[in-house]
């Protein structure tokens, strides 16, 4: 009897099959990264910079003047310098003095940033405030080489580089993590069934009425007010496992490449499909004939032979392949759908046409998304 009770308790506490952690399904409202951007100059390039770009020359003059030197714009040659935009993402809770990676991209005519050094660049947020300062040596994965005869060789993208840990935080971004008596979890993909499952899983772990689903995306969770307890609570909360609802039946079609992605929950109602293809071939040929000669006198003396005449000869041929027909039974599944279409040798473009026709006929029990 004791063994049976222990087994029942273990089964009750075991996570559901195919369960996902809340940290993989949701994000905490207000806890997010913030984009930063700045304009700067990269120096130390081996002749692959912007050249005589006025933008780069003005930037260099402004930078040098801030260092206490005076120089005319015309005296500056920017072959070894490049104007760049610097971008970064400021993660939540990053403190003053900590570092982050930055991405550097050219805005002028620079051929490559390889071997360059980014000079001190302020990084601003959307509010115009400076949150970080970036500086350091660039790591460039691409390669660009150009010869004097105009020939060139480019591998990957040499005009974009990174400065690992090249940005230093100068100002923190406040988050509402500790400002209220509750937390709000937002699903990465809104779904009412999944929102209800998340609330049920949290209440099963922490007790009744701790979580309530506000809508198909947000779940409100009561949390301790003490910061230390709230962090511990969050570490437990994000590891709660729930069984999300099956995704919406959806078929995604890329009409340009012929790529089709069909969800596992897609089904088709009874339908008969006939699909044939029409091929039109146009061939061009040239026919050459001798033009009329110039004849003089009663003796029909040929004074000048005729010029050759080129006449285009076009042939149009229409070939219609036999129509391919197949029938879908009620509630046919994904595998049966794919097998039936592949069995008749349908190409990706044929598959796109068949799916669109099934949707128009009301036989496709799924959302068709064309990208």
Curated annotation (Swiss-Prot):
It is found in: Periplasm; Bacterial flagellum basal body. The keyword Repeat does not apply. It comes from the Bacteria. The keyword Signal applies. GO terms for molecular function: structural molecule activity. Disulfide bonds: none annotated. One of its GO terms (biological process) is bacterial-type flagellum-dependent cell motility. Pfam families: FlgI (PF02119). Residues 1-19 form the signal peptide. Keywords: Bacterial flagellum, Periplasm, Signal. One of its GO terms (cellular component) is bacterial-type flagellum basal body, distal rod, P ring. Assembles around the rod to form the L-ring and probably protects the motor/basal body from shearing forces during rotation. Belongs to the FlgI family. The basal body constitutes a major portion of the flagellar organelle and consists of four rings (L,P,S, and M) mounted on a central rod. HAMAP family: FlgI (MF_00416). This is Flagellar P-ring protein 1. It comes from Cereibacter sphaeroides (strain ATCC 17023 / DSM 158 / JCM 6121 / CCUG 31486 / LMG 2827 / NBRC 12203 / NCIMB 8253 / ATH 2.4.1.). The lineage of its organism: Bacteria, Pseudomonadati, Pseudomonadota, Alphaproteobacteria, Rhodobacterales.
């Amino acid at each position: 009897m004791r063994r049976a009770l222990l087994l029942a308790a273990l089964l009750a506490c075991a996570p559901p099959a195919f369960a996902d952690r809340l940290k993989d399904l949701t994000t905490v409202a207000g806890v997010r990264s913030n984009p930063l951007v700045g304009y700067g100059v990269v120096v130390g390039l081996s002749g692959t910079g912007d050249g005589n770009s006025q933008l780069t020359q003005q930037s260099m003059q402004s930078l040098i003047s801030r260092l206490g030197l005076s120089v005319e714009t015309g005296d500056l040659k920017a072959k070894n310098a490049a104007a760049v935009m610097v971008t970064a993402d400021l993660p939540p809770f990053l403190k003053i003095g900590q570092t982050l990676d930055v991405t550097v991209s050219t805005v002028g005519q620079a051929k490559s940033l390889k071997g360059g050094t980014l000079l001190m660049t302020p990084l601003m947020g959307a509010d115009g405030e400076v949150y970080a300062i970036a500086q350091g040596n660039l790591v460039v994965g691409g390669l660009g080489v150009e010869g004097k005869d105009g020939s060139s060789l480019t591998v990957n993208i040499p005009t974009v580089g990174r400065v690992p840990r090249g940005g230093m935080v100068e100002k923190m971004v406040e988050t509402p993590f500790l400002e209220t008596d509750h937390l709000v979890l937002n699903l990465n993909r809104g779904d009412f069934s999944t929102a209800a499952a998340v609330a049920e899983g949290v209440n099963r772990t922490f007790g009744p009425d701790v979580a309530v689903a506000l809508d198909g995306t947000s779940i409100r969770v009561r949390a301790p007010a003490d910061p230390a307890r709230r962090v511990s609570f969050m570490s437990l909360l994000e590891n709660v496992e729930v069984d999300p609802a099956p995704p919406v039946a959806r078929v995604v079609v890329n009409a340009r490449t012929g790529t089709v992605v069909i969800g596992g929950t897609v089904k088709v109602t009874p339908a008969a499909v006939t699909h044939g293809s029409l091929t039109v071939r146009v061939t061009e040929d040239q026919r050459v004939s001798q033009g009329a000669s110039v004849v003089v006198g009663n003796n029909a003396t040929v004074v000048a032979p005729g010029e050759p005449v080129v006449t285009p000869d076009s042939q149009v041929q229409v070939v219609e392949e036999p129509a391919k027909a197949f029938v879908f039974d009620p509630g046919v599944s994904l595998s049966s759908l794919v097998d039936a279409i592949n069995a008749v040798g349908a190409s990706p473009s044929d598959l796109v046409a068949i799916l669109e026709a099934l949707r128009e006929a009301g036989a496709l029990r799924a959302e068709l998304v064309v990208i």
